[in-house]
Structure formats: C-alpha cells, structure tokens
Amino acid sequence: KLRMSLIPQQELNRIMKRYLDGAEKYGHNNWKKGMPLSVYFDSAQRHLQAWWQNDQDEDHAAAVVWNILCAMWTENNKSDQDDRHEYTTK
C-alpha cells in the first residue's frame, strides 16, 4: 500500500501551489494537454539553476518538481510528446 504520510506535507503544498497557479492562469488541468518532454526538461533545468543561485523571485525548487511530475505524466500518457529521440546522439 502507498503511504502518503511519508511525503512531507509542507513541500507537497508548495508543488500543489504550482498546479493551482497554473489552473488560475491557464485553466483547470490545462497542463494535461501536454507539451514535448524537452519543454519540461528545459524549464526544470532553468529553475534548478535559479534555485542553485538562490534566486528568490519564485519557488524554483517547487517548479523543478512540477516540471518533472508533468514530464513523468506526459511520458506515461502522451507518448506522441516524447521528443527525447531528437536530442540523443549516437
């Protein structure tokens, strides 16, 4: 059984705020329309760098997690948005 009590609630709330802000700005579950995985990857990388540089203009750590969660959902539900093959080298 999954034990949701193991997830730290305060940090989970920070991620949930990202979803709520998006719903207010773009509409309920708009993120489920999907975007190429590269868009989530690029955004996560930008937010990770901003977090690492201690940029305080938004919750960059939560944005990193939000992007990864959306990428995971896209990977499982929108295989047509998986553009990783376009960026791999042989």
Per-segment meaning from a language model:
Residues 1-90:
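Intrinsically disordered, low-complexity regulatory regions
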